[in-house]
């Protein structure tokens, strides 16, 4: 048994361990936050779909720019040829009312992919059609049945540099970097507001070679409410924690290893002494 424990301790000495700490985030970080999104709305066409953002200060931006693109999909989720446009451009000028009605009748969808930056403040980004409210009102006045089906798939959401996120996931097992990836929700009711509440936690990863990676992990919860008179919308409401998680890779220290080995031998001699005393009393 002692030999086994000695071998285990000796082998354990060469195993890289990870220490976690919860600290106050007093780092001088950037004033902006990059958000990476890949989202499919399965039953709302690209013609009347936008990504909007607003923050704690009340600032609101419609039809955000960045690198976001919209790709039209057919009812089976296949890409419609040559139908791709950047958000922030005058895509809304490139269609007719007949195009929109046809897209709804064909159950077309839309995939939004790319990145954009927001102020590093509590806020939200939302997938919505209220920018096109006058057009939607016109359709309804004509008696056209515009059905807002919010069924969607979140292929990917992350924060800051995508390359760093991928690298950290390869090097570390700790943290929750992309918990929403692959999430699918069916919602074919016409009067819903879907809210995702996201708690973002600044995180620092220190590799065994002391190289440091900055990232953001996050958790979320989802809640559905009645939209009332609003156009059905999906909100991603985020808040940034004042605390920071730190993960540090390290080898066990020489002193700790020596103490454990001494404890093994000490235990071995103690057991041997007790056994010897028992045998002397018996015999």
Residue ranges of model-derived segments:
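Helix-loop boundary elements of multi-pass alpha-helical membrane proteins
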Residues: 1, 13-19, 278-283
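Alpha-helical transmembrane signal-anchor/signal-peptide segments
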Residues: 9-33
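Eukaryotic beta-rich interaction modules
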Residues: 5, 15-18, 96-99
């Amino acid at each position: 048994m002692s030999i086994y424990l000695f071998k285990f301790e000796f082998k354990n000495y060469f195993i890289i361990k990870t220490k976690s700490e919860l600290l106050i985030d007093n780092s001088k970080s950037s004033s902006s936050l990059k958000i990476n999104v890949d989202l499919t709305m399965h039953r709302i066409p690209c013609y009347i779909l936008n990504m909007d953002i607003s923050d704690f200060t009340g600032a609101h931006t419609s039809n955000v720019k960045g690198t976001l693109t919209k790709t039209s999909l057919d009812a089976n989720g296949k890409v419609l040829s040559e139908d791709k446009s950047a958000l922030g451009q005058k895509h809304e000028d490139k269609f007719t009312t007949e195009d929109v009605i046809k897209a709804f009748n064909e159950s077309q969808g839309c995939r939004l992919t790319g990145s954009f930056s927001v102020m590093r403040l509590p806020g939200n980004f939302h997938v919505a059609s209220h920018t096109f409210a006058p057009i939607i009102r016109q359709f309804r006045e004509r008696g056209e049945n515009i059905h807002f089906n919010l069924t969607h798939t979140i292929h990917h959401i992350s924060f800051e540099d995508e390359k760093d996120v991928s690298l950290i996931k390869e090097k570390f097992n700790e943290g929750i970097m992309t918990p929403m990836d692959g999430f699918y929700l069916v919602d074919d009711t016409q009067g819903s507001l879907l809210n995702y509440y996201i708690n973002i936690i600044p995180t620092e990863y220190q590799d065994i070679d002391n190289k440091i990676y900055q990232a953001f992990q996050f958790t979320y919860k989802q809640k559905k409410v009645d939209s009332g008179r609003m156009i059905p919308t999906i909100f991603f409401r985020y808040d940034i924690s004042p605390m920071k998680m730190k993960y540090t890779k390290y080898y066990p220290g020489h002193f700790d290893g020596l103490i454990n080995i001494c404890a093994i031998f000490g235990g071995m001699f103690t057991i041997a002494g007790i056994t010897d005393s028992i045998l002397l009393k018996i015999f």
